[in-house]
Structures are given as C-alpha cells and as structure tokens.
C-alpha cells in the first residue's frame, strides 16, 4: 500500500479520517506526510480541548493554509517549538519517503525525530484541522512513564538542539517541561 498510518491499538479513528487524508493528498504534488487534528481519549471520555491541545493547534495554524504545506522553513519552525504532530494521526506516503526509517534511539520522541528528518525534504506536510481520531492518554504509556522518571527531558533537549543553540534549547525545554503535566490522567 502506498499510504501507511501508524495506528495504535487503543486509539479510535473517526469515519472521516480516511476521507480527510485522501482529500488532503489530492491537493498535493509530492506529499510526505498527511495528518489530521486529533482529540484525546482519557478514562474512556473524549477530550476535545485542553491547554496542550490548544497549544498544539496554535502551532499548526500555519498549516491550515495549503500554501505553507511545502514550506520547509514553516514546518521546521513549528517543530522547533515542540512535537505538535500526533503520531497516530499521521499517514506516511511511502513512495515519497525513500530511504526513510524511524530511528530506534529514543523511547518517547521517535515520532518528533522522524518529522524533523522528513521536514528537511522537498514535499508537503498536508494537514487537515478537523479531528480524525482520538489518541488515548493513559498512565501505562511510554510517554507517561518517561515523564514520571524525568527520562523525557533528555530526549526533548536533544530534539530542541536540532533547531536551536544549546542555551536557547535549554530555555525552551524548561517551558516545554510544564506542558508534560497535561499527560497526567
């Protein structure tokens, strides 16, 4: 199959997910990834908005305009502030990602690292602002475990250093660390 979605077994996909991904793909010449907005699933309840979702949606605002989908500068600025793209909401376009593979050097930020690498390529990051799925937030997740053990800080700092000088990366990481509180169930 030319399109691959990294679905998690405990996430829920809405009926519009496939429609929205295919509609966005039709607007592209060379799509790299296609992704939708998402909601959270906490304790069996759908959460459509909270502080973290608001920040992520704000970061992704430029990508509501198709003219920015192929703009590497815009994509990289979005990623330089944090991981606003929800991994299970992403569909990869395999034929446009030759020689790409996820690296196995992190526990939590594997996806952010992947988007950073892909953001350097020519092509589009196609985004639809309609929620296409629900991402389950739970205490047993790798992200929650790493936050509890403070293991995620090193990974976040590593990622910020891909975009910023060390001292700026440290400042952003301190602010970013506060957002981790929203991963608590």
Task: Report residues per predicted region.
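Short aromatic/hydrophobic "clamp" motif used to bind/position activated sugar donors
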Residues: 4
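The conserved acidic donor/metal-binding loop of glycosyltransferases
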Residues: 8-12, 37
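Alpha-helical elements of Rossmann-like donor-binding domains used by nucleotide-donor carbohydrate transfer enzymes
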Residues: 12, 16, 20-23, 113-117, ...
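Conserved protein kinase catalytic core
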Residues: 14, 43, 142-144
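Conserved donor NDP-sugar-binding/catalytic core segment of glycosyltransferases
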Residues: 16-55
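Conserved nucleotide-sugar donor-binding catalytic segment
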Residues: 60-152
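C-terminal, non-catalytic tails of nucleotide-sugar-dependent glycosyltransferases
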Residues: 61-69, 73, 124, 148-185
């Amino acid at each position: 199959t030319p399109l691959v979605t990294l679905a998690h077994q405990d996430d829920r996909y809405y009926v519009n997910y496939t429609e929205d991904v295919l509609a966005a793909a039709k607007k592209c010449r060379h799509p790299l990834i296609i992704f939708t907005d998402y909601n959270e699933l906490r304790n069996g309840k759908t959460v459509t908005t909270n502080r973290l979702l608001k920040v992520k949606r704000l970061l992704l605002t430029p990508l509501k305009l198709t003219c920015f989908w192929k703009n590497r500068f815009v994509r990289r600025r979005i990623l330089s502030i944090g991981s606003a793209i929800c991994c299970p909401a992403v569909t990869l376009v395999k034929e446009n990602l030759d020689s790409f593979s996820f690296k196995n050097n992190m526990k939590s930020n594997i996806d952010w690292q992947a988007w950073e690498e892909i953001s350097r390529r020519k092509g589009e990051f196609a985004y639809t602002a309609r929620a296409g799925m629900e991402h389950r937030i739970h205490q047993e997740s790798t992200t929650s475990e790493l936050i509890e053990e403070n293991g995620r800080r090193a990974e976040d700092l590593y990622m910020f250093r891909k975009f910023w000088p060390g001292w700026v990366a440290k400042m952003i990481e301190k602010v970013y660390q506060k957002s981790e509180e929203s991963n608590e169930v």
